Each structure stands twice: as C-alpha cells, then as structure tokens.
C-alpha cells in the first residue's frame, strides 16, 4: 500500500519510457535470434569434430603425382614409377609407410564406375540402371598408411600383380549395396568401362572388406567404394600418402630430392598434411560459426547496454518517487526487486519474440547443421538462460543505485 501511495504522487514520461523499452526489446530479440543461430552452428561444429573419418590423419603427409602421358604412355611405365617411388620414400628416415591412392579422402575427388555384373549376372537396380560405386586405385600399404580398418579378408598387397586375377576390396557401404545381408568375400563383380584398362571391362573377386571412409566431407554420408591395386589397374595420377614418425613437413625436401633423381621434370603438387585436409573440410562451417558468433556477442553486448541505459535513466527520472516510496516504508529490497523486475519484463518480451522468430528462421540453417536439429531444445534453453543472466547483471548497478536513494532528500525536493 505504501508503494502504491508513493507512486501515485509522481508523473513519468510514459511515452518516452515505452519507446525506450521497445528498443530494448528489439535489441534482445535480435540478440536471441543471433545467439540461437550461433549456438546451433557451434553444436553442429562440435558434432562434426567427433565424426570418425574412417582413417587416422595424424602424421600423414600427402602430395599429388601426375605422370605426363607423353613420357609415361604405357601401363608398365606407370606401374614401375609408382612402385619405385613407394620404395624410395619408405627408405627415408622418419617414414613408416608410403602408398598412393586414386582419390584422396576429403579432396572431393569423384570417380564413379558402374558395376555391370555380380556373380556372373546383371547388376541392375532395375532394367537399364546399373549400380555404381566410387573407384579407388591404391598401391600396397595404403590401408596401413591411413590406418583404415580391415574388417574381413585381406588387404591388397604385392601379390596382386599385373596378369593375376583382379583382386577387389570393398567398403561397408559397397558390401551392403551389392550383397545386402551376405558376406561379400569370394563374390565376383565386373567393373564397367575404365580408362585404367584402356576401355576394357574388368572382372574381379572380392578379397577384403574395409570400414567406410569419409571421402566427401565429415558431414556427408559415406558412398560405396571399391579398391583395386594400381599394379592391376594402372592409372597415371595418384595422391601419395606418407605415414611419418617425425613432423610430416620436415620430409618434403627429402621426398623432393628422391623425385628429382627419378624424373627431374615432375613437380610435387598439393603438398599438405591429412590434418590440413581435415581442417579444410570443416573450414566453411567454422567460418559461419565464428561470423554468426561475433554478431551474436555484439548484439548481446548492445542489448545489455540498452537494458542498463534504460534502467539507469529511469532511476534518475524517478529518484523522487523512489525516495517517497522509501519514506512511506518501502525496504531497499523492494526497490531492488522493482528495478530488476522491470529488467526481467524487458528481457522476457525480447526473449519470447526472439525465440518465436528463431523457431521459424533457424530452419534456414538446417542445411548447414550436422547431428543437431534446427529446433534443438537445449540450445534454445541455453540462450534463454544466458539472456536472463545478462539482463539480471545489467540491472544490478541501477538497482543498487535506486536502493541508495535518500528518502529525506526526495521529501525536501517535493
């Protein structure tokens, strides 16, 4: 009753107060929208970092090697070159294993090949539509170099020579596509026309199964892949992978020296570590997360300043009213609750509007998210708690200032 009696004696600038309050609510709404988007992208980025790429990138150096067809026109020349290159690199101090692959993981290298026959019969999903997989040509030790898990059978090795029956290793996705519910070992398949064999089809037998590898991005689904030996399926381009026990970049000069001895005209292209390939694959999500995060923090700061400014102005304008309330029996705690309550009302309005807007607009982000829903409840709850905490902190100084108003000074001014 004392608070109401004191408040009735004071006239306030209601129109100006409503305008200032509306601006703060708008700032809070914008902050909620940006914070929710940034929170979703952050959670998605964390989920991406947890994805198993199907290989171990640590300590692996990579570079591209393309042989000019004018000087390496025959398949046996390509076989001999990459066999010797593997041998020379593996002999270097600090190198554990080395191998080449036609299609490095996370490099967006895409080479699809049709599967024309399975176990002697047609390999069609329906008439006229052949199944297809990604083709990977590798040299021995590739799976060991990249630490790819062998799930069944054997890996491709030196016994898979030119002229011998074509040996094929498939990944889990290819196994499920081509022989669902069955063990693929020992099954035969015929690969479609390929430049690797001069346009001829290649029939082979499955000798091993490996785990899926994320070739097209950590957030992308793994695709069916078949692996064949370079000695049996010669190509003139491979990405070399080198597993090292020393810092990978420290071996670049030695590798370049070995290559110069083999062919001084061949360059060492795209020299990177697999850790760099992994980092590059999440560079875009990281950029979006940081950009939205910066704007969100700025919006949150402006909203906090807005709440502080509105409350500080209101306390100055209503100091006489507050003093009268105190003189009529209001406690300091009552005054603090009044000021903080005003802050919570402003924050609540902005929070409600912001969450409703976020619920509608964050669906636009769904294409950028991995492993998290665009309406993730934990993210929305976290943003609500953060905004409430910021509003509370922003109101503390004006609230304490209001609680220290001297009622005797206010009564003399009245």
Protein language model regions, located:
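Hydrophobic alpha-helical transmembrane segments of multi-pass inner-membrane transport and secretion
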Residues: 16-42, 285-320, 348-349, 353, ...
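Transmembrane alpha-helical interface segments in multi-pass membrane proteins
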Residues: 299, 320-366, 382, 386, ...
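Membrane-helix entry/capping segments
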Residues: 8-24, 232-237, 256-257, 261-299, ...
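Short juxtamembrane loops and helix-capping segments at transmembrane helix boundaries
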Residues: 2-12, 47-60, 330-332, 357-385, ...
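Intracellular coupling helices
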Residues: 1-10, 305-346, 401-412
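Conserved G/P- and acidic residue-centered "switch" motifs that form tight phosphate/ATP-binding loops
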Residues: 153, 171, 329, 354, ...
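Nucleotide-cofactor and metal-assisted catalytic machinery
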Residues: 40-290, 413
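Alpha-helical transmembrane segments of integral membrane proteins
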Residues: 1-72, 408-414
């Amino acid at each position: 009753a004392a608070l109401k009696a004191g408040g009735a004696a004071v006239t306030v600038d209601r129109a100006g107060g409503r305008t200032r309050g509306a601006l703060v609510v708008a700032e809070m709404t914008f902050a909620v929208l940006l914070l929710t988007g940034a929170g979703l992208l952050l959670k998605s980025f964390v989920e991406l970092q947890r994805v198993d790429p199907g290989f171990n990138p640590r300590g692996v150096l990579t570079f591209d090697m393309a042989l000019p067809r004018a000087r390496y026109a025959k398949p046996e020349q390509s076989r001999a070159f990459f066999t010797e290159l593997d041998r020379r690199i593996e002999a270097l101090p600090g190198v554990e294993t080395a191998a080449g692959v036609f299609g490095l993981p996370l490099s967006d290298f895409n080479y699809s090949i049709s599967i024309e026959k399975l176990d002697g019969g047609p390999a069609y999903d329906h008439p006229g539509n052949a199944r297809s997989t990604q083709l990977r040509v590798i040299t021995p030790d590739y799976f060991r170099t990249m630490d790819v898990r062998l799930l069944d059978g054997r890996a491709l090795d030196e016994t898979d020579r030119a002229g011998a029956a074509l040996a094929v290793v498939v990944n889990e996705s290819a196994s499920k596509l081509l022989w669902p519910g069955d063990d693929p070992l020992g099954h035969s398949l015929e690969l479609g026309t390929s430049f690797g064999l001069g346009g001829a089809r290649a029939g082979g037998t499955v000798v091993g199964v490996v785990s899926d590898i994320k070739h097209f991005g950590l957030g992308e689904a793994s695709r069916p892949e078949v692996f064949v030996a370079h000695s049996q399926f010669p190509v003139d381009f491979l990405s070399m992978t080198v597993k090292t026990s020393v810092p990978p970049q420290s071996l670049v000069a030695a590798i370049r020296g070995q290559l110069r001895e083999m062919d001084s005209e061949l360059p060492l292209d795209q020299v990177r570590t697999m850790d760099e390939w992994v980092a590059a694959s999440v560079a875009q999500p990281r950029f979006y997360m940081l950009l939205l995060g910066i704007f969100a923090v700025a919006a949150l700061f402006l909203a906090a300043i807005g709440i502080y400014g509105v409350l500080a102005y209101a306390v100055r304008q209503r100091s006489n009213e507050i003093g009268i309330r105190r003189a009529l029996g209001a406690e300091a705690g009552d005054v603090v609750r009044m000021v903080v309550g005003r802050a919570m009302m402003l924050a609540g309005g902005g929070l409600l509007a912001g969450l409703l807007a976020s619920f509608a607009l964050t669906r636009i982000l769904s294409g950028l998210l991995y492993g998290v829903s665009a309406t993730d409840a934990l993210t929305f709850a976290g943003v609500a708690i953060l905004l409430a905490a910021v509003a509370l902190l922003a109101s503390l100084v004006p609230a304490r200032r209001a609680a220290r108003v001297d009622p005797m000074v206010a009564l003399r001014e009245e």
